Amino acid sequence: MTANPTSIHQRLDRRLSGFSLEQPFYTSPEVYALDLQHIFYKQWLYAVPVCQLAKAGSYTTLRVGAYEVVIVRSRDGEVRAFHNSCRHRGSLICKARQGQVAKLVCPYHQWTYELDGKLIWANDMGPDFDASKYGLKPVNLRNLDGLIYICLSDTPPDFQTFAQLARPYLEVHDLKDAKVAFTSTIIEKGNWKLVWENNRECYHCSSNHPALCRSFPLDPEVAGVQADGGVSKKLQAHFDRCEAAGTPAQFVLAGDGQYRLARMPLQEKALSYTMDGKAAVSRHLGRVAPPDAGTLLMFHYPSTWNHFLPDHSLTFRVMPISPTETEVTTTWLVHKDAVEGVDYDLKRLTEVWIATNDEDREIVETNQQGILSPAYVPGPYSPGQESGVMQFVDWYAASLERALAPRQVAAE
């Protein structure tokens, strides 16, 4: 179902607080285009862990809507991002998802770029051709303590405030000393907002995530912040114990709701996301104390949520690919010197979240199918169980409302 001529502003104005969005926000190509234009093309997006680009010439590619981006480590050690489009006639330069190169060479006419984006060879372009004017177009990039974020906008929003807040939480995890143990990419046949809504609550966990529930707590007093923003005594005691051991833990939320950090406890006696609750990696990534510090939960809308544990870390990247399809990439990080088969078993490390991701995929797809019905109308969220969903939807609605000023009407 496409959006009707009613303005998006009017749909947002009549949105009931505590209810899901109207159907076009989950189904309409026009609303999807607005989401890309005003959110994904303007906000800082998580891309990859920096350890994925370990050597000069290591690169990865990323598609954000219509944009193609290549991220590469240069010979000076800096990681840079460029539009993955040759300045000659526009061909993709790097076609693979990741790789290792000496130079960035366009496969079409062999225009050749240095790893810092400078054009260094273009055959037979005439005596007046100035190669210095045809370097690759840069993309804004920030390295947040081992996590690479990019922004496609020529006028990127502030990143420093988030970085200053997050850095002390991340520093104890030593992500600069990480390596990628495994990466999983799945396509969920659901709108990107449904993927986020599902992530932001555990109302569904007990009936859908048997493996995750072996370690992730369902007790509302320790599983999250209360609907009014308060913290239970149990949770505050956990925060205080971690802080006393030198590990930042307190709940912090951005003023506009875009990002949040909090170090949440796992099930009693659980140390990591494994079937038995024991550590998945014997050589720990980071200096987190105490051993049962739980998981640092960090999200940054619209592209990432993360779990940083005492023994390993997981990053999740959310990327919309159509109005009803979303790519979810999960990366497991371990210490760079951890040896598979000695310090960790790959199946044991990954099985909980591989199962959980697939269960979430089915949930999101079933949710999307029901929303496609003409009978769908917005329904109420649970204040006690789905306050996180309400927080995400409020952030999304406010972000789109601000971006669309002056008022804009969606096409039929």
Swiss-Prot record:
Binding site for Fe cation: H204, H209, D360
Positions bound to [2Fe-2S] cluster: C86, H88, C106, H109
EC id: 1.14.13.247
Classification via InterPro entries: Rieske_2Fe-2S (IPR017941), Rieske_2Fe-2S_sf (IPR036922), Ring-hydroxy_dOase_2Fe2S_BS (IPR015881), Ring_hydroxy_dOase_asu_C_dom (IPR015879), Rng_hydr_dOase-A (IPR001663)
Cofactor(s) needed for function: [2Fe-2S] cluster; Fe cation
UniProt similarity note: Belongs to the bacterial ring-hydroxylating dioxygenase alpha subunit family.
Protein's job: Monooxygenase involved in the catabolism of stachydrine (L-proline betaine), a source of carbon and nitrogen. Part of a Rieske-type oxygenase system that catalyzes the demethylation of stachydrine to produce N-methyl-L-proline (monomethylproline). Stc2 is the catalytic subunit.
Protein name: Stachydrine N-demethylase
Organism: Rhizobium meliloti (strain 1021) (Ensifer meliloti)
Gene name of the encoded protein: stc2
